[in-house]
Curated annotation (Swiss-Prot):
Co-factor(s): Mn(2+)
Note accompanying the cofactor annotation: Binds 1 Mn(2+) ion per subunit.
Protein name, per record: Phosphoenolpyruvate carboxykinase (ATP)
Species, as recorded: Porphyromonas gingivalis (strain ATCC BAA-308 / W83)
Keywords: ATP-binding, Cytoplasm, Decarboxylase, Gluconeogenesis, Lyase, Manganese, Metal-binding, Nucleotide-binding
Pfam families assigned: PEPCK_ATP
Record-listed ATP binding positions: 207, 226, 243-251, 292, 328, 444-445, 450
EC annotation from Swiss-Prot or TrEMBL: 4.1.1.49
Higher taxonomy: Bacteria, Pseudomonadati, Bacteroidota, Bacteroidia, Bacteroidales
Family: Belongs to the phosphoenolpyruvate carboxykinase (ATP) family.
Entry function: Involved in the gluconeogenesis. Catalyzes the conversion of oxaloacetate (OAA) to phosphoenolpyruvate (PEP) through direct phosphoryl transfer between the nucleoside triphosphate and OAA.
GO biological process: gluconeogenesis
Gene name, Swiss-Prot/TrEMBL: pckA
Length: 535
């Protein structure tokens, strides 16, 4: 048994502490006989284990809270009546009760403790310790965070932040504590502790630490970004891909012709781009070996599937969304062949790509943005929310999520826009808005065409292509690109009647204008209105 002392966190009488277990040990633990309910993992034909997470098959943003105290009162971007977000306050008194529930659930149990790093740069990385009673949850964080070397573990010392996952505990008295339900995902930034109660969804542990990095890094003059990143084989040409869940971040950055830095969370400092994570968390609904070979091949022993349909013999049906559209796999980043080694970081990004899945069929498949448009569309963060990444959403609905990640922003959105644009201006980077959604055919733009567009951005051929302007939005769009169907580049050409595009375009332009009002409270925001759509 580990000599680790958990009493300093209030956890008493642990019957056994398994500290930094190996993958082999976790595999035995999560598939052993006698496990019940959501603790149980099932071995699949691909060698990966599948687990189910119950009613929570996505994050639960309504249950996310920060303790409001002297640390956070004037720094957190709190939710308000006029501009709602997920940063809801909870009192220090309520926190005591919430933490007590987690501590009592974990006390007297056999526990897993996993020590990780968040952030690939030694100068800014955090030591995060996860404590849980469920083997597959330990496996999940081992996949998703940076795994310290033996030597780094020997000198690990005290963590910078502690996460207690107590999925079996419920908050019965949630109303009197000012919470939303029996489920709670609560951060205390003074104590540097996160508590997760009554949800089994793995993504809460991953995204919790993203919210914390999003709090710390911009205050230290770094950009903190909800994006994927890759670089050329010689590691000289870096690109970053912003986008909300389901817009193609993982798919498009996982490119056999380039090296992956990471698929979801990155920082940008004076030296370049660095990953926060040590793994990938890919959506696997309708996954096929043909369309996404790298992700498909990453699903093997030590990968962990979530909420995928698997029959008694272990056969996987990736097309079945009866449990959720938000089926996932986590795997250590080295399951992808082309990655930046040994540390997931590279130089400055010259190409910045905003991915938007437009359900209206209005946006061009690619637009070259001016610096002012870059700020405007970054703050707008438009996409159509795609099925199932949050509870209760199954049809595409338009959404504006500041900085392509409002759910994870702990500070005001303009802070992230400032840091990003500062870094872009420093290196002369260009931004492109890429629509991975629908057009006038009623079908989604093909992965083949989107990949052709990304190739043209990365190899620079888009910057030499002839262009035209698109009305209302004043987007500069190429009229021809190698390997891309020329008939889709102007979205009007995909409609049987271009007047239908005009009607839809006016509607979408109006939504952009209305949404942007919330950013016009200061001069910087007011100045950007001119870069947006005009009716």
């Amino acid at each position: 048994m580990s000599k680790l002392d958990l009493t300093k966190y209030g956890i008493l009488n642990a019957t056994e502490i398994i500290h930094n277990p190996s993958y082999e040990f976790l595999f035995e633990e999560e598939t052993k006989a006698g496990l019940e309910g959501f603790e149980k993992g099932q071995l699949t034909e691909l060698g990966a284990v599948n687990v189910m997470t119950g009613v929570y098959t996505g994050r639960s943003p309504k249950d996310k809270f920060f303790v409001m105290d002297d640390t956070t009162k004037n720094t957190i971007w709190w939710t308000s009546d006029e501009y709602k977000n997920d940063n809801k306050p909870v009192t220090p008194e309520a926190w005591k009760s919430i933490k007590k529930l987690a501590v009592e659930q974990l006390s007297g149990k056999r526990l897993f403790v996993v020590d990780t790093f968040c952030g690939a740069n030694e100068s800014s990385r955090l030591k995060i310790r996860f404590i849980m009673e469920v083997a597959w949850q330990a496996h999940f964080v081992k996949n998703m965070f940076i795994r310290p070397t033996e030597e780094e573990l020997a000198n690990y010392g005290e963590p910078d932040f502690v996460v207690m996952t107590a999925s079996k505990a419920k908050v019965e008295n949630y109303k009197e504590l000012g919470l939303n339900s029996e489920t709670a995902v609560v951060f205390n930034l003074t104590e540097k502790v996160q508590v997760i109660l009554n949800t089994w969804y793995g993504g809460e542990m991953k995204k919790g630490m993203f919210s914390y990095m999003n709090y710390l890094l911009p205050l230290r003059g770094m950009a903190s970004m909800h994006c994927s990143a890759n670089t050329s084989m010689d590691e000289k040409e870096t690109a970053i891909f912003f986008g909300l869940s389901g817009t193609g971040k993982t798919t498009l950055s996982t490119d056999p012709k380039r090296k992956l830095i990471g698929d979801d969370e990155h920082g940008w400092d004076k030296d370049g781009i660095f990953n926060f994570e040590g793994g990938c968390y890919a959506k696997v609904i309708n996954l096929s070996r043909e369309n996404e070979p790298d992700i498909y091949n990453a699903i093997r022993r030590n990968a962990l599937l979530e909420n995928v349909t698997v029959d008694a013999a272990g056969k996987i049906d990736f097309g079945d969304k009866s449990v959720t559209e938000n089926t996932r796999v986590s795997y250590p980043i080295y399951h992808i062949e082309n990655i930046v080694k040994p540390v997931s970081k590279a130089g400055h990004a010259k190409k910045v790509i905003f991915l938007s899945a437009d359900a209206f069929g209005v946006l061009p498949p690619v637009s070259i943005l001016t610096p002012e448009q870059t700020k405007y569309y970054f703050l707008s963060g438009f996409t159509a929310k795609l099925a199932g990444t949050e509870r209760g959403i199954t049809e595409p609905t338009p959404t504006f999520s500041a900085c392509f990640g409002a759910a994870f922003l702990s500070l005001h959105p303009t802070k992230y826009a400032e840091e990003l644009v500062k870094k872009m201006e420093m290196v002369g980077a260009t931004a492109y808005l890429v629509n991975t959604g629908w057009n006038g055919t009623g079908k989604r733009i093909s992965i083949k065409d989107t990949r052709g567009i990304i190739d043209a951005i990365l190899d620079g051929s888009i910057d030499k292509a002839p262009t035209k302007a698109i009305p209302f939005f004043d987007f500069k769009v190429p009229t021809a690109l190698p390997g891309v169907d020329p008939n889709i580049l102007d979205p009007r050409d995909t409609y049987a009647d271009a007047a239908e595009w005009t009607t839809k375009a006016k509607d979408l332009a109006e939504r952009f204008i209305k949404n942007f009002v919330k950013f016009t409270g200061n001069d910087a925001g007011k100045a950007l209105v001119a870069a947006g759509p005009k009716l």
